[in-house]
Every structure is written in structure tokens, then in C-alpha cells.
């Protein structure tokens, strides 16, 4: 499994995260291409900067004739003369993108608005974003999602986050670090307050990236492929960079997952579909039903739920509420999995991504990405199996490159 491990020893911001992705090999023009449907005129200005002896990639989002503004993207709600945007306007802009990029970016901006609304005592719709700051965040948030996809990352891990300390000036006044909305976004995320760094190290955009895109806040056992650095804007006593490790989880790495099972023999079949939906909504990684026969030859269904250990109690509570079960078994399985990478192959129908599974340094399986093949089949009006056939013809070149 290809993963990205973030080491935010000097905090995180939207531009630092973009800089890290580019430093790890993502082409900024490809990110920009993914965002073309926004119909927003902007440029990525990419340069190398030296931060206390560490060479890092700096990425700025530049709008023609407008000043960069990312640190605080919410306007003073008591001064309506500000030019700005509300959440509905931001969602309208993001809705021009294609799924899943659109869905993830909108969800992230809604998370940002929810934090601001809670702090300022407003509804989400009344949160007022700076005109330029909001568009900065739109590009950085959508670019973060697109960049991870281009990098082929399947899971994001993160270490403890340095927030900095002291106070910061905003349009609302002098706020402690982290600022209230940022602190709200950081709930549930491991942080530490570095009293030696008297400035704000985590911006709201950086916090929402952590909140929305990080799968687990822990240090995994991984084989490192690349190390990258995204540059921040400040010159501090420590390098103002976001460090990231791109690599693979070792097959022996424990997943931290639990398997919950229960046998149900007295529930209406109509309720099982609803149960599955609710379990996925609650954070289950997988849910499956197995027909079984219990004592007295009574037909029943074994409900199996795979989830992260942190979700165990929530899943159990939901299982008891939404089913007739009054007991469940909890297992801690050790998962062994092949290393997975994503490559692109050229076919007569265009470029198509394929998943490559390797175990013990040997390729054991190559499979086309279903959604990409389905989209091409629909666009060209051809059978899906014809697209699969074209991919299989081109698979030999992938084997040679791995």
C-alpha cells in the first residue's frame, strides 16, 4: 500500500502541503489541469527556497492583479463592506469539478465553515470569506485532493502537529495560537504547543487538510521511497517546512483494524440494507453478510463489520441499535497484504490507470481501474469488456517498468 506520512514539526498550511506534493514529484501543471473546470484564472508559482539549510519547494497560488492571502480566510462579519463570498458561492464554484474531487473539496470547505460558524455563533451560510483568501483556499483544498490522487497515495498518516504558540492578529482582534477556528478543526488530532516558536504554525486551510485527508494519526512502519519538503512563508528558528515521507507499508504492518461479527436470525430482510448503509456512514471499512444455519437448522445471517479500532465502540452501539442483535464477537485480525501501486498504461482508447499488486518483490496481479474503464466505455459507446481487453494488451509494458 502506497502511503504518505506527514511530519508537521513546523506546522502546516495549504501552500506548504502543495509544495510538499510537488517536491515529491507531482507536476503542478497536472494539478492545474484537474482544476480547469473551476473557471478561475490563477497560476502556480513554484520555486525552491532554503529554510535553515533545508531546500524545500514553495508553491504560491497567484491570481492576476490580486494579493496572496491565505493565513486567515474569514472576514469580520460585523463589517459588510468587505468583498467576499459565502459558503453557497464557494460550493457553486467547487461544483464545477468532477467527482470524487468535487465531493471531497466541498466536504472540506463545509468542515471549514462549520468550525468558523461555531466560533462566531453564526450559521454556516453566514460565514463570510475574504474574496482572495477564499479563492486561495479553494485552489489549495481542491489542489490537495487532486495532488494526492496524482501521487497515487492510498492512505495518509500524520505525526503530532506543532501549532506554535503566542498570539496572532486577525480582523476580530488578538487571538491566541492556535486561533479559535483552527483549534476547533484540530479537535481529535494530536498536537503540541511549542513555546519556543512564538507564532502561528497551523493555518485554517492546513488544519482542514489534516482533518479531512489524514486517515490515521500515528507513525507507521514503512519503506521510504521519497522524502519531500514543502516550504512555508516564515523564517523561524526551525526550518519552516512540512516534511513528508512517500513509501509503502510493509506487509507485516498491523492495520489497527477490528472485525466485529454477530449472528442474526430474527430480523426482517428489509432492515439489512439499511443496517449496512448506517454502518458505512459510521466509518466501517467493509460490511458483508453471510447466509448461515444456526442451531435447530434455523436460517440466519452473519453480519461482519471491519473498522478501525477507534471506531469499535461507535460501531457496536450502532449494531445494537439498528439490528436485533444483543451480543457480538470482536476479533483483532493481523492483515497481510500485497504492496499496491498505480501505473498508467497507454491503450487505443487513451491512458488508463491499473493497479499492480506485488508480494515478496514479485508481481502477483494487475487489474484495470474499474471506474476509469467504465467511464471510457460509456463515453465511446463500447462494451466494458472491450476496454478491459485493450488494457490487457498493454499490460506487458507495465510489467517491464515495475
From Swiss-Prot:
It holds the Pfam family Ni_insertion. Keywords: Lyase, Nickel. It is an enzyme of class 4 (lyase). InterPro entries: Ni_insertion (IPR002822). Signal peptide: none annotated. It comes from the Bacteria. Transmembrane segments: none annotated. It catalyses: Ni(II)-pyridinium-3,5-bisthiocarboxylate mononucleotide = pyridinium-3,5-bisthiocarboxylate mononucleotide + Ni(2+). Its EC number is 4.99.1.12. GO terms for biological process: protein maturation. One of its GO terms (molecular function) is lyase activity. Involved in the biosynthesis of a nickel-pincer cofactor ((SCS)Ni(II) pincer complex). Binds Ni(2+), and functions in nickel delivery to pyridinium-3,5-bisthiocarboxylic acid mononucleotide (P2TMN), to form the mature cofactor. Is thus probably required for the activation of nickel-pincer cofactor-dependent enzymes. Belongs to the LarC family. HAMAP family: LarC (MF_01074). This is Pyridinium-3,5-bisthiocarboxylic acid mononucleotide nickel insertion protein.
Amino acid at each position: 500500500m502506497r502511503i504518505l506520512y506527514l511530519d508537521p514539526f513546523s506546522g502546516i498550511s495549504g501552500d506548504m502541503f502543495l509544495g510538499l506534493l510537488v517536491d515529491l514529484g507531482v507536476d503542478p501543471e497536472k494539478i492545474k489541469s484537474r482544476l480547469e473546470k473551476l473557471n478561475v484564472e490563477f497560476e502556480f508559482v513554484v520555486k525552491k527556497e532554503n529554510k535553515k539549510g533545508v531546500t524545500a519547494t514553495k508553491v504560491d497560488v497567484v491570481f492576476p492583479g490580486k494579493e496572496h492571502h491565505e493565513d486567515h480566510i474569514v472576514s469580520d462579519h460585523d463589517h459588510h463592506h468587505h468583498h467576499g463570498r459565502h459558503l453557497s458561492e464557494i460550493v457553486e464554484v467547487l461544483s464545477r469539478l468532477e467527482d470524487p474531487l468535487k465531493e471531497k473539496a466541498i466536504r472540506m470547505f463545509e468542515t471549514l465553515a462549520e468550525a468558523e460558524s461555531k466560533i462566531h455563533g453564526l450559521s454556516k451560510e453566514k460565514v463570510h470569506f475574504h474574496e482572495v483568501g477564499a479563492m486561495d483556499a479553494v485552489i489549495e483544498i481542491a489542489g490537495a485532493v487532486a495532488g494526492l490522487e496524482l501521487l497515487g497515495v492510498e492512505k495518509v498518516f500524520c505525526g503530532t502537529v506543532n501549532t506554535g504558540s503566542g498570539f496572532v492578529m486577525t480582523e476580530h482582534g488578538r487571538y491566541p495560537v492556535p486561533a479559535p477556528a483552527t483549534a476547533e478543526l484540530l479537535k481529535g488530532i494530536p498536537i503540541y504547543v511549542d513555546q519556543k516558536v512564538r507564532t502561528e504554525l497551523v493555518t485554517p486551510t492546513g488544519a482542514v487538510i489534516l482533518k479531512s485527508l489524514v486517515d490515521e494519526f500515528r507513525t507507521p512502519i514503512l519503506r521510504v521511497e521519497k522524502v519531500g519538503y514543502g516550504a512555508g512563508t516564515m523564517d523561524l528558528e526551525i526550518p519552516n517546512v512540512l516534511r513528508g515521507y512517500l513509501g509503502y507499508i510493509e506487509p507485516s504492518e498491523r492495520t489497527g483494524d477490528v472485525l466485529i461479527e454477530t449472528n442474526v436470525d430474527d430480523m426482517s430482510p428489509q432492515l439489512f440494507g439499511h443496517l449496512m448503509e448506517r454502518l458505512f456512514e459510521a466509518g466501517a471499512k467493509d460490511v458483508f453478510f453471510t447466509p448461515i444455519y444456526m442451531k435447530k437448522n434455523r436460517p440466519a445471517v452473519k453480519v461482519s463489520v471491519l473498522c478501525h479500532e477507534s471506531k469499535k465502540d461507535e460501531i457496536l452501539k450502532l449494531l445494537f441499535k439498528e439490528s436485533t442483535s444483543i451480543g457480538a464477537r470482536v476479533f483483532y485480525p493481523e492483515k497481510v497484504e500485497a504492496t499496491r501501486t498505480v501505473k498508467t498504461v497507454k491503450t487505443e482508447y487513451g491512458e488508463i490507470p491499473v493497479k499492480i499488486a506485488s508480494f515478496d518483490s514479485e508481481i502477483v496481479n494487475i487489474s484495470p481501474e474499474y471506474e476509469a474503464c467504465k467511464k471510457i466505455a460509456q463515453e465511446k459507446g463500447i462494451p466494458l469488456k472491450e476496454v478491459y481487453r485493450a488494457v490487457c494488451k498493454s499490460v506487458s509494458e507495465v510489467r517491464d517498468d515495475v
